[in-house]
Amino acid sequence: MHYPKVYDVIVIGGGHAGTEAALAAARMGRQTLLLTHNIETLGQMSCNPAIGGIGKSHLVREIDALGGAMALAADKGGIQFRILNSRKGAAVRATRAQADRVRYKAAIRHTLENQANLDIFQQAADDLIVEGDTVKGVVTQMGIRFDTKTVVLTTGTFLGGVIHIGLEKSSGGRAGDPPSIALSHRLRELNLPVGRLKTGTPPRIDARSVDFSVMTPQPGDFPSPVMSFMGDVSMHPEQVSCYITHTNEKTHDIIRGGLDRSPMYTGVIEGVGPRYCPSIEDKIHRFADKDSHQVFLEPEGLDTHELYPNGISTSLPFDVQFELVRSIRGMENAHILRPGYAIEYDYFNPQALKFTLETKAINNLYFAGQINGTTGYEEAGAQGLLAGLNAARRAWDQEQWTPKRDQAYMGVLVDDLITLGTKEPYRMFTSRAEYRLMLREDNADQRLTPVGREMGLVDDVRWAAYCEKMEAVETETARLAHLWAAPNNPMGKQFVEMTGADLSKECSAIDLLKRPNINFTQIAELTGSQVSTQVGDQIEIAVKYEGYINRQHEDVAQLKRLEETKIPADFDYDIVSGLSREITQKLKTVRPETLAQAHRIPGVTPAAVQLVMITIRKNAQTKKIA
């Protein structure tokens, strides 16, 4: 059958990339079709039941700032919220939400089903209609042809997916779901650069068989943070604790004894796994000097006893999984509900993409998510939104858009993928961003919401809330700048009494806030401020980090001017503070002549280039003084 409706955008896949892609295109007014093999699994959390974390929550906030669904779904489904790196600087603070799988998925599905311009159809895609070098349509498993102007492919782990438990293997996109074999073959016919990656998941545990009394409870933060700029604590369901236990030498001996039946260590799995989320087999091999590893027992939801033991992802045979689980303190009688497994799947070298996530070989075909070599819901969602908005703009012959590295973590993600490529699953960290003080969680809306509004991604309600917030920030900052505390006036005396700090001369409330040990809550109490916590936090960060932020803006401008800066032939990379051993060795081997050349060396990060630039500048200043 030839379906009568012609779409602007067709999105294949209903995971985290696909849902954000479809929602973005539909919000922009494009006629959009989301093809999924199973409507019941839209927005499903296939691995760990959590959203956010270091580097990742920055992406979630950026998705949210552009009108995406992930952050609000996390607020509606989150059963524990924590601020990570809370004692560190604002640039690296991150929000993490432990999610109820069912509630999160329900929130995503509700958003999809209530989005104007978006049709959903349950059917696997088997073929792409390509005429010349341009995609024109999609053919489903039962032979239905859908015509479209653009296609966004978000296949996750389904392309040629193979599940491994011990030396047994079976076809699957994830446990219980079939793989996408026909589409995998079709993409290989298009001569796109394909490779294999792998990821894994731990066995799931019945909480009723666990002794929590010997474990360390890990409660959420109070007051509870929110993930979305539009979020509110009232959205949160009941909050619960996670629990921490550890592996031990007995656990490690059991694992070592099973390595001869491990698909990873017998060469059965060829795909490369995620470096920063290794299996327990990898951990005891790579960190042989450690006699224990943390295991976080995370509830899968409020209406289930199922636990996710974060830290023991494995593809060992089930009998070994059974023994290793029961060797862990508090889990001596644990009942496994589902075995852990590894999954191997196709991905395509992201260097074959444009910065808009459109393939270079096939016009109007966009890739997003794990198909590009990334790992993580947040990385997938960010790519999905970018691919969706660019497919939507291409459908109406509008200019494509990708944020720069100094504008968003999304920009860092895309630039890393396209410039460097990847041979292992790519995960976002704050350390990948050289301008991270400018790319904080709290200001994602300032950086991106106005851009999103221009492109039609941000609705009236979100835009009004953003404008109200920014007006409050501006008004309150101006108010505090005109409130003065002096040693002998009431405000000054109250400040000294309240904080125990010295006050030797007159200064504004803004100047008081600049002090290291003074926070906005104290200033609010002192001055009678009525603004929200979100507004207060934004003001405090802007005030305290003003000098550093201004310096980083200067660095952005200077790095652009100095892209062709010469590196002295005898430059000593060993004196560059903060440069990793791996990057130092690469620079010593290649000996780049310019910063631009250094930037192009695979594995040399923009942050490393900036460190080299700063050292060159310091050396030049030292020579001038001498």
Curated annotation (Swiss-Prot):
The keyword Ubl conjugation does not apply. The keyword Zinc-finger does not apply. GO terms for cellular component: cytosol. FAD binds at G13, G14, G15, H16, A17, G18. InterPro entries: FAD/NAD-bd_sf (IPR036188), GIDA_C_N (IPR049312), MnmG (IPR004416), MnmG-rel (IPR002218), MnmG-rel_CS (IPR020595), MnmG_C (IPR026904), MnmG_C_subdom (IPR047001), MnmG_C_subdom_sf (IPR044920). NAD(+) binds at residues 273-287. It is found in: Cytoplasm. SMART domains: GIDA_assoc_3 (SM01228). Keywords: Cytoplasm, FAD, Flavoprotein, NAD, tRNA processing. NAD-binding protein involved in the addition of a carboxymethylaminomethyl (cmnm) group at the wobble position (U34) of certain tRNAs, forming tRNA-cmnm(5)s(2)U34. Homodimer. Heterotetramer of two MnmE and two MnmG subunits. Belongs to the MnmG family. This is tRNA uridine 5-carboxymethylaminomethyl modification enzyme MnmG. It comes from Acinetobacter baylyi (strain ATCC 33305 / BD413 / ADP1).
